């Protein structure tokens, strides 16, 4: 962490680079408000503090859903700090908001040899380079440009010596999309492309493809309700309806697959602010108060409205 803040992380490689500490602070603030007016609440509010949100393969949200604690919940709302939106605004988008996120690991095994005698080996680095180009070609040429699909190789490891043809390469990456059928498609095509690679270049490859978060899809009526709350408590100028969704992922999707609701983006953007997951990421703490107000009001007014309909 390079923020220089007095509460900066003291552990190398570990920091709050995605704003989840501010999410907890906001929810605790909302809890304090709701507790102070609990006698006026016409129902129960359950608060979820994002356990294991950053772990895509073992998301905490799915564990919460599986526990059954949300079985009697009528609607659910959440937020995430969002540097792409200005401080003082809230992003409210109907439908697709954030993508599904899958994780894959690939091992391409060749045969090492002296760098002067490549014909006596099977170069796993050349094979890996070939495969990466094939992936990009599949995404660019087999996918409708209007259908969102992103595949990124984030890790590639292979080779030990400059003059030795590499015998093993390990790759790791992610695929993002909004459509379940696209997840099926890309998993199948990654496997098929490795099989073709093995036939062409005499490698032996394996694919370990793991499904992560599903797509975060907001209920239109829930967004309309949240918009009315933002307008009432933060002002109409605070409302932003983003034109495009994000290819980032969020385990709140597990809740929205089960319960009507919406996920909101709380603007934290200021001049020169770094992106999420950057070592210099921080927030403008001015966003905490409106975040608290919004979340408390969403819960309190929902219960009031639900009670009046009975």
Tell what function each PLM region has.
Residues 25, 58-59, 192, 224:
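A generic alpha-helix surface/boundary motif
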Residues 16-17, 285:
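Short acidic-aromatic active-site loops that bind/stabilize oxyanions
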Residues 5-15, 21-22, 28, 34, ...:
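Histidine/acidic-residue-rich, glycine-tolerant segments that coordinate divalent metal ions
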Residues 129-310:
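Metal-dependent amide/peptide-bond hydrolase catalytic core
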Residues 1-2:
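Cytochrome P450 core scaffold surrounding the K-helix E-X-X-R motif
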